[in-house]
Regions:
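Bacterial Sec-dependent N-terminal signal peptides
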Residues: 1-24
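Structured catalytic-domain cores with a bias toward divalent-metal coordination
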Residues: 19-389
Length: 389
């Protein structure tokens, strides 16, 4: 009898504990009001006590996030006190090329644009990188450097690659199957670790901002596998408190006709209550931090396990996904594009498209809502309903 009573007492305690841990909309709102500040100020606040800040980028195609990133870089404190930014996008062996581009002098805007496109055609191991925000980012960074006495240096961290050295589909397969590609998080961490000590200290310190996609930024390891994400590697290399990981607000994943909102939409509802005013905040020991992380592949983790903070910038229904770089496939580049297309598509065991189909894949400008496949209105209606419940 005593054992039975003890058993049901444990069940009751576990149930009550679950209720105590669940967070209401008001809990999230209260937390934001108590702990948050403007996103740009939040990033520089992190740099006061840590040398490396990692921003977990949302969908690679989103252009709105680069408005914020450029605001951070445009702040005078960045060039004067930090000076170095690193990105996932871009093959490491193109780092010198990109800095010649960004710190060069051009007589006209068209002259810079020509140099930018010539560089972009060789930056990536895909036939071309089609995300328009790369143009947005590099053009913005060039303008910052052009008008600033203190120059910002860009480091590229992705796999070493050159299209000039790839002649066959088998050679591309060998690259794609290489350990460097299979363990890209380790590769990008290694490349950063090679460049970081070479930085010129600013005010006696080396500091760096790293921009990498959300999954890479995680302070996590795949459950049951010896595969660290980039954020995990960086914290192990440079110290838990010396590396701060911040995630931009995002959705969970795409699944058929749905794009689930984090915490069943309560986060987004809290942002809406706050008037969608951008903010950044630490999440440890907050309702945000206690929220279970949505990807079970990493085990039973909470948000405070995988990141140190969050930045809310733009509601989900205002995100803009843009692909295609108009003019990137010039007439002079068409032959080289088709050479790459044949190699790449054969290596991936896919039918090789003709030029009239291949060219628009990269230079046709196309924008669509960040809520795709749902409409922005339906997502906003879902959030507004949560506010009324």
């Amino acid at each position: 009898m005593e054992k039975r009573i003890a058993f049901w007492f444990c069940v009751l305690c576990a149930t009550l504990s679950g209720y105590a841990q669940s967070s209401s909309l008001q809990d999230y709102v209260t937390s934001v009001r108590a702990k948050s500040c403007a996103p740009v100020d939040y990033v520089f606040k992190l740099f006061e006590h840590s040398d490396i800040v990692v921003i977990g980028e949302r969908d690679h195609r989103d252009t709105t996030q680069y408005e914020l990133i450029l605001d951070i870089l445009r702040d005078a404190r960045f060039a004067e006190d930090i000076g170095y930014v690193y990105t996932e996008v871009g093959c490491v062996n193109r780092t010198k090329d990109v800095n010649r581009l960004l710190q060069g002098k051009y007589k006209t805007a068209q002259a810079f644009n020509d140099a930018l496109y010539a560089y972009l055609r060789n930056e990536d191991f895909n036939p071309l990188w089609d995300k328009y925000n790369r143009v947005q980012f590099l053009r913005g960074l060039y303008e910052i450097n052009r008008s600033n006495r203190h120059k910002i240096t860009l480091g590229l961290t992705d796999c070493k690659f050159s299209w000039n050295k790839i002649k066959t589909a088998q050679e591309y397969r060998d690259f794609d199957d290489s350990p460097a590609c299979a363990y890209r998080d380790s590769t990008m961490s290694l490349h950063f670790a090679e460049m970081y000590p070479k930085q010129k200290p600013k005010n006696g310190k080396r500091k760096a901002l790293i921009i990498t996609n959300h999954p890479h930024a995680l302070n996590a390891t795949f459950a049951g596998k010896d595969y660290h994400r980039q954020g995990k590697w960086l914290k192990e290399l440079y110290g838990e408190d010396n590396v701060k990981i911040v995630m931009l607000n995002c959705t969970e994943y795409i699944q058929k006709e749905q794009m689930p909102l984090v915490a069943s939409g309560l986060w987004d509802a809290a942002f809406e209550v706050m008037g969608c005013q951008p903010f950044g905040m630490d999440i440890k020991e907050t309702p945000f931090g206690r929220e279970p992380y949505f990807n079970a592949r990493y085990g039973d983790l909470k948000w405070e396990d995988i990141a140190d903070g969050i930045i809310y910038y733009k509601p989900i229904y205002e995100l803009v996904l843009t692909i295609g770089i108009p003019g990137i496939v010039s007439i002079d580049f068409e032959v080289e594009l088709m050479r790459r297309i044949r190699i790449y598509f054969e290596a991936m065991d896919r039918p090789v498209p003709p030029l009239e189909e291949a060219k628009p894949m990269y230079d046709r400008f196309l924008s669509f809502p960040g809520t795709y496949p749902q409409s922005p209105h339906s997502v906003r209606d879902t959030i507004l309903r949560l506010m009324k419940e």
